[in-house]
Amino acid sequence: MLRQQMPIDRPIPSFYGCYLLRSTIRHSALYVGSTPNPVRRLRQHNGLVKGGAVRTSRGNLRPWEMACIVTGFPTSIAALQFEWAWQNPHITLHIPPSSRISHATQKKRSGHPKRPRHTLQSLLSNLHILLTVPSFSRWPLEIKFFAPDVHRAWLKWSKAATGSLRDTLPIITDFPPAESQVNDEDGEITDRPYGIEALNVAYEDTKSHLEKGERIFHSEMKESCNICNQDLQHNSGLYTICPNINCHSITHMTCLSQHFLRAEKNEQSGEELIPVQGMCPGCRMDIRWNDVVKELSLRMRGQKVVEKLLGAKRVKKGKGIATSQEVVESEGDEEEEEEEEKEQELVDYFDADEFHARNVAQEENGFVDYLDDDDSDAVSNISMESSKSPKRKRTIGPFSKAKLIAVIEDSDVDEEIEGEELER
């Protein structure tokens, strides 16, 4: 099998999250997945639009709700790594044996450890552990809770947990209001977006940062690094700019990184390579490293995205956040097909490399299922070929065409592959 490589010339994605889905009919029915667009993904799980997953297609469990979501992943693969570890805390190598609280007591027919049945408490406790282990503790992540009872369960476990979360890890709540409508400043009734509807999944938050970069970096620029004071030549290095609009600080990427890390070492010991956040040498405001390098990645690798974003019409007042996910969905068929091919590349990448799933056809296929224990492997295997890209469509065993049509397709790469895979 040829080793496949993922392209490294893409900018940091505007949004990617790992979510915990819960049935509103039966709260013990849980599902873990990942997506770049939570609103679209939830609609798929609830059968409102094409897509979703076999497990969430059961009518007696719909509608589903997103109880919480972890966001801020720097790449799609990073989200998949975290998702797989969250789905499989009993075998993931990211959790050291001394910290593991989920253990496999049974084996599948293939001989691999069978995932223990999860509860809300086990998923939240393992989420807490993953956010404290070295693999993920310094990632620029955020946790958002949309269900009050789930947040209370999280707080209860956090008090009893031995490991502590990073102080700068944002934990945000956005619960449904007492009334779905609130009065605006003019006294008129208006809908206030909340929960996943309020998530900004486009690059709108980065737009002003990009506009600032467009003004600074040009062929006749005469600037110097704010840290080392060396002259900065156009297109001859990786230069970072502060996201604060009124700040004029420009630095080498390595200079800013070392500046942040030196400040961190004064507060804690360790030999970290990538900072989390730090104080801008210009405006002296705290800024997040991920915000800085996201603009840099777009400037260096996402020219088409930048041109479209800066050249797009302004969104009408009051609809910025609420429509960000609609903007993503209305980009056109051509871009949607391109995105689907990228998602399929992610699946192929893990199939061929990270998971070494050579015998995946004989294995229990990967849909994250915390529902009934008596689900057969055959039902899981139906969902194996769920790519929407016609170029990569494959035939599945002896199943009839009618049965295949009845299966809800997957998207957003929320599959887990359980072959010979003890991941990264």
UniProtKB/Swiss-Prot annotation:
Q: Does the keyword 4Fe-4S apply?
A: no
What EC class is this? hydrolase
Query: What are the required cofactors?
Result: a divalent metal cation
List the biased-composition ranges (Polar residues): 378-387
Per the record, the zinc finger regions (SLX1-type) lie at: 225-283
- One annotated Gene Ontology cellular component of this protein: Slx1-Slx4 complex
Where is the major localization of this protein?
Answer: nucleus
Q: Which UniProt keywords apply?
A: DNA damage, DNA recombination, DNA repair, Endonuclease, Hydrolase, Metal-binding, Nuclease, Nucleus, Zinc, Zinc-finger
Can you say where in the cell this protein is located?
Nucleus
- Compositionally biased residues, Acidic residues: 328-340
What's the superkingdom here? Eukaryota
Gene Ontology process terms (BP): double-strand break repair via homologous recombination
Q: Does the keyword Nucleus apply?
A: yes
Any one GO MF annotation of this record: zinc ion binding
Pfam family for this entry, one: SLX1_C
Which Enzyme Commission number(s) are on file for it?
A: 3.1.-.-
Chain intervals with Basic residues compositional bias: 105-117
**What's this chain's function?**
Catalytic subunit of the slx1-slx4 structure-specific endonuclease that resolves DNA secondary structures generated during DNA repair and recombination. Has endonuclease activity towards branched DNA substrates, introducing single-strand cuts in duplex DNA close to junctions with ss-DNA.
Q: How does it assemble?
A: Forms a heterodimer with slx4.
Q: Which family does it belong to?
A: Belongs to the SLX1 family.
Name of this protein? Structure-specific endonuclease subunit slx1
